[in-house]
């Protein structure tokens, strides 16, 4: 397939923010792929996602930094590196630099007698970039740069622009998974729900695309969990009233301790190998060799996928330690030392698959029973503490028991016949009830950083505040909620430039909906936990714009930073719909007669 066909689609995607147009452009591109070579549909999907393969594969990245790209452009365009650097300062986009310089590259002399070069194919671009990624060892940096330069020489100026942006990790398309799923549904002749279900059970959108176009919609319906391939996790809603929680769940529920740890999906493969995925579907197996051993000893099955929480514990008392301790352990290079300093326990709460049986369509009581059968419990590897509750008093009492033992609160789960495992979905089958929700402040929310403001005075030289947004599921975009500048320690403020640097954008990212213009735009990637005084109507912020009141969105008053949430991706952030529910819930309480 001609790479120019893909590039034409990328260019059109870059020019629009309309969800309808994005889906139409993707649909036409996928139809073209099916006509030309349907076997590459998975790779085209990955390319649009800005990657060569899903992150959880654990394969190497392309591994060429900014300086290396500058050198590759200079080699390809036959100009000095200083000229590339100067133009980069002027344009702020290495892709545009490559496009301009390749358009001016010398074509006279001997080149006049050379046969016109063949059009570059997508297959060649992908395979070359893949080859670059796997170049390792001594001399690999120079080889990577020369290989990239060779690819740029074969490309048209416009193609060079997108190759460079891809290598730099800055495609700037504004395309989310939801838009790709909708387009795949169109070309496969099925519904969005069918594609989404398959993706939720097998978190590899390229692989799902290949099933859709090579095997058809019926094959998509047969997709089930597969050990070694992460399942997109089920998510919980939130409420702060025991009566409302039980009402939502149909009168009773299974209340489980909510642990302050790292959610983990533990896969036992038929060959006895254990793989661990984080909530963000990252392969974190190397960080937890102790958990690997717990699973090998404690899972009595040939193959299984179970879910639980990895919690840091005090080695002397066995009491839980904060989530930050776990993240500190993850950052340590000496894993053996980290294991001794910060030991962990695993609290299991669900089973997704076991010995050929898909458990996601089974109600919770059956899944819990099967989990009990499969797990041989030990002090380090056991089921979550849980209790069946049917009255607000029972729920409240169990909540305080959880708090007194050093945990966050409860997750209360439906136990009726339809209490299935909704992979990748947030719904009212699971409801969080945390201690933070008992305060007079608004519930803490997880928001995505989309901009930053320079600090003044004591904060000079770094950023003093962040623009944060909720996830707008309807538009597959990020809508602003507030500007947060308090709650940061001096150390956290000092780290902000380094933390934000990989995500800084010269222009507003396509998926960001904002009336506020920060000093620096930030591509949606980092998630922060924020708390505030209340949720109010706002003529400035765009979260839930026009949904509650015409012309107004919702904002958080007096927001305060609590902590970073490295375990969450941008689409895992609190949704604008959830913020609307929080606003209405608070409003209802204010309006209730005393």
From Swiss-Prot:
It is an enzyme of class 6 (ligase). Signal peptide: none annotated. GO terms for molecular function: ATP binding; DNA binding; DNA ligase (ATP) activity; metal ion binding. Gene3D superfamilies: DNA ligase, ATP-dependent, N-terminal domain, DNA ligase/mRNA capping enzyme, Nucleic acid-binding proteins. SUPFAM superfamilies: ATP-dependent DNA ligase DNA-binding domain, DNA ligase/mRNA capping enzyme, catalytic domain, Nucleic acid-binding proteins. Keywords: ATP-binding, Cell cycle, Cell division, DNA damage, DNA recombination, DNA repair, DNA replication, Ligase, Magnesium, Metal-binding, Nucleotide-binding. It comes from the Archaea. Its cofactor is Mg(2+). InterPro entries: ATP-dep_DNA_ligase, DNA_ligae_ATP-dep_bac/arc, DNA_ligase_ATP-dep, DNA_ligase_ATP-dep_C, DNA_ligase_ATP-dep_cent, DNA_ligase_ATP-dep_CS, DNA_ligase_ATP-dep_N, DNA_ligase_N_sf. The active site is at residue 258. ATP binds at residues 256, 263, 279, 309, 349, 426, 432. Its EC number is 6.5.1.1. One of its GO terms (biological process) is DNA repair. It catalyses: ATP + (deoxyribonucleotide)n-3'-hydroxyl + 5'-phospho-(deoxyribonucleotide)m = (deoxyribonucleotide)n+m + AMP + diphosphate. DNA ligase that seals nicks in double-stranded DNA during DNA replication, DNA recombination and DNA repair. HAMAP family: DNA_ligase. Belongs to the ATP-dependent DNA ligase family. This is DNA ligase. It comes from Ignicoccus hospitalis (strain KIN4/I / DSM 18386 / JCM 14125).
